[in-house]
Amino acid sequence: MIKKKLLFLGMIVPMFLLPANAAAQHPHDGHYRPDTTALSRTQHLGEVVVRGKYVDRVNRSAYNAVAIDTRKLRNTNLDLAHALDRVAGIKIREEGSVGSAVQLNLNGFTGQHVKVFIDSMPMDNSNTSFGLNNIPAGFASQLQVYKGVVPVTFGGDAIGGVINIVTDHSPRTYVDASYSYGSFNTHRSNIALGWTGKRGFLVRFNAYQNYSDNDYKVKTQWTDLTNSTISNEEGWFRRFHDRYHNEAVMLQTGLINKSWANKLLFGLRYTHEYAQVQNANLMKIVFGGKLRKNWGLSPSLLYEKRNLFTRGLNLSLSARYDYTVTNNIDTLSRTYSWTGQWIPKASQGEGATSLAEFTGKTLTAVANLTYRIGDKHFFTLNETYINFHRHTTDNSANRAMTSAATFMRRINIKNITGLSYQFIPNNEWNAIAFVKYYDTHVTGPVNVSETTRAQYEEQQRNSQALGYGAAGTWTPGHDLQVKLSYEHAMRLPTERELFGDGDYEEGDAVLKPEKSNNVNLNFNYEHTFADAHTLVAELGLNYRNIQDYIIRTINAKGVAVSTNHGHVLGQGVDAAVH
């Protein structure tokens, strides 16, 4: 399979090395990026101005994309998740308050079907402290939202869309800071500093923190400690063990606008998180002493060079190494009720006894090459490599855990190659065709027992697959645009789905990738009246046919597990008027 892939690349790469005289000159080709800036129209969402910053050709591309200019949100307490919640077609669902899990819904696609990137680099396996609902909106200069088919520049396995966080590398000097206080003793603050010298030396510093007691009221069933039964009715109770705080510090420095590099930036990010765990995946199962702690360190590198060797050939290289340490602590010999009262428990641990320490190591590397031939032909080649390792490092603390799977290796390696061709014959229509090659290697514990008693052994599984698709757009009039796209894509299982979280999320290392056929049809109408008022109407139809759909279920003990469900058929309609 490796030989086949090398042959595949060997046929593709020469296409990008055509002689310079094969490409017509264009005054803007040194700054042209056909895949990553396809951002359409202007929208006003509250105080957020959504603007398309694009080359005219890209504006007429088949990608359905919008952008939020988050510079309007500097010095506010808004986070990236709630900034996205203002975009038509996006819904944000939080499991609780500050520090809780966040799920994105983008035109009917949810969870892992929608991927998040920072500067076109996947955020897979980043520390949970560095999540959309923790990062201040001012951290980004722009949020790009791609719905449906996405450019191969985003080399992940998204089948529902992509959210790309674009950070600020502009040559300017600034200081931004904010602090806010809210309900439930919530404190949020952030600071951003930037300086660029006359010779292109750049320094960027960002830091933020979030804190909350999260002692709001919830309606749930509760445990009667006199007979250890759970009530049939529900009552209102105040959360008493849900304190959360996290901190992050980011430093980036390097050079911009040099003859040998448009960008060469080195970065370092430190994150820390402390979270009390109030309940299991089922709210009726409550805890009073369980908690989770983690910290992470992430060095990174970004290199960009436009007009490499020949005019119109642009190269981008980025890499990041994520090192995270997580502690799941559950040692109290107690059984709690939602009233805050408790009774002694014969065994240690409110759930499963744990002092476990897990170490995760992830290497992410992305190479992107674009080439323009004349004014009508555009090629993009992308290679994305993600190597994840996780192991338990504290053996003595886990003596109470009897599972042999505890100390087995957990490895997930993903290699995705994408190639696209865009044809722009005129201003009325254009089309894009693309192909993706997926190569995955998974190593982890597998339950091989045929009885109720678990028996684990370490197994390895390799899989390869091919994805492909096409998209086109037609502009029959000045105000109307029609977009049609089809994609046969893969959604690879995440590390959490494969290996769990070592606590109340159980993994399944033999999960198969989802295989999906998606069709999207969009109508966009925009008309400006008297150069002062703009009416925008959008109608979107989507169809998806998914095989081996990965579904998350929760058992009676509050433990979640992901399994391949089978066949899922989905159809949707979304409409918006601005």
Predicted ranges, named:
Residues 414-418, 511-512, 518, 526-578:
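Outer membrane beta-barrel strand-and-loop segments of large Gram-negative receptors
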Residues 180, 198-283:
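Periplasmic-side early beta-strands and strand-to-turn transitions of outer-membrane beta-barrels
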Residues 47, 80-83, 100-105, 130-133, ...:
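N-terminal periplasmic accessory domains that precede
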Residues 192, 216-224, 276-285, 327-336, ...:
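Outer-membrane beta-barrel translocator domains and adjoining extracellular loop/strand segments
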Residues 81-122:
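Extracytoplasmic beta-strand/coil segments of soluble accessory domains associated
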Residues 26-72, 81, 540:
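Short, acidic, small-residue-rich periplasmic hinge/interaction motif at the N-terminus
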Residues 113, 121-147:
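Short acidic/polar hinge/loop motifs at secondary-structure boundaries
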Residues 252-273, 292-452, 457-458, 462-481, ...:
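Face-selective signature of the C-terminal outer-membrane beta-barrel domain
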